[in-house]
Amino acid sequence: MPNIPTISLNDGRPFAEPGLGTYNLRGDEGVAAMVAAIDSGYRLLDTAVNYENESEVGRAVRASSVDRDELIVASKIPGRQHGRAEAVDSIRGSLDRLGLDVIDLQLIHWPNPSVGRWLDTWRGMIDAREAGLVRSIGVSNFTEPMLKTLIDETGVTPAVNQVELHPYFPQAALRAFHDEHGIRTESWSPLARRSELLTEQLLQELAVVYGVTPTQVVLRWHVQLGSTPIPKSADPDRQRENADVFGFALTADQVDAISGLERGRLWDGDPDTHEEM
C-alpha cells in the first residue's frame, strides 16, 4: 500500500494527496471502486452535486475499514444553487445525500460570472463553516482577480482552489498567487484526460530513468509543484499506480521541462465565460 502523505491547509486542517476523483463512479460498482481506493491508502474523495454520486461516496465511507475522521470528503456547490442562503441549503442537501454530519472540504464548483452570485455564495459558505456544517472552504475554477475579491470583501482566504492543471496547462501565474496567499492548488484532469500527453517522448524517457510509468511521472510533477492531483479511476491497479509517486523525485530541470510542454486548456473552460449550472 502506498504511503500517502498529508499536508496542512491554511486553516490548519489536514489534507491528503493525491485524492480520488469520483466523477462517473456511481452505483454499486462506483462504491466498490471507492472502497478499493480507500483500502489502497487514499484519504481524499472528491465529489460534487453535479456528479450525482454523493450518496455513493457516503456509502463508500461507511463501508470502508478506515475511521471517518481519517477521511476527507469534498463536495461542490453547483451554479444553480448560488447565493448566500442557497449555498447553506445546498450544503445541507449534500450532507443528507452523503449521510454525513460534516463535509471536510466544500468548494464552489464554478464562479458562473454571468449569474454574478459567487461572492454571496462564498459568504454562505463562511456561514456554513461557522455553523459546523463544513470544516474547510474553498473554490474551484476561480481566477486571480476573483480570489482577490473574495479575500478583500470577506477577509477569508479560500483553503483550496481546484483548477484545470496538467503539463499542457501548468498555470504558473495562478500557482504563484496561490503560494503567496497560502491557497492550496488542487488539480483536476491532472493527466490531461489521458490524451496524447502520456505518449510525450519526454515523459516516456523519464519513466525509463526512474523505473516508473509516464502516469507516475506526471503525478509526481504535480506533487513537486505543490499541487494536489485528483486522478479518477475505477481500476484498483491503476488507483495504486496513481498513488505510488513518493518513492522518487524529479530534478528541478526535469520539472521545468515537463512544464515546458504547455499548450493550453483541454477545452473551452475559461472561468471568465464558462457556465455550469
UniProtKB/Swiss-Prot annotation:
The active site is at Y51. One of its GO terms (biological process) is L-ascorbic acid biosynthetic process. It is an enzyme of class 1 (oxidoreductase). Substrate binds at H109. Its EC number is 1.1.1.274. SUPFAM superfamilies: NAD(P)-linked oxidoreductase. It catalyses: 2-dehydro-D-gluconate + NADP(+) = 2,5-didehydro-D-gluconate + NADPH + H(+). NADP(+) binds at residues 189-242. The keyword NADP applies. It comes from the Bacteria. GO terms for cellular component: cytoplasm. InterPro entries: AKR, Aldo/ket_reductase_CS, NADP_OxRdtase_dom, NADP_OxRdtase_dom_sf. It is found in: Cytoplasm. Pfam families: Aldo_ket_red (PF00248). GO terms for molecular function: 2,5-didehydrogluconate reductase activity; aldo-keto reductase (NADPH) activity. Keywords: Ascorbate biosynthesis, Cytoplasm, NADP, Oxidoreductase. 2-keto-L-gulonic acid is a key intermediate in the production of L-ascorbic acid (vitamin C). Catalyzes the reduction of 2,5-diketo-D-gluconic acid (25DKG) to 2-keto-L-gulonic acid (2KLG). 25DKGR-B has higher catalytic efficiency than 25DKGR-A. Belongs to the aldo/keto reductase family. This is 2,5-diketo-D-gluconic acid reductase B. It comes from Corynebacterium sp. (strain SHS752001).
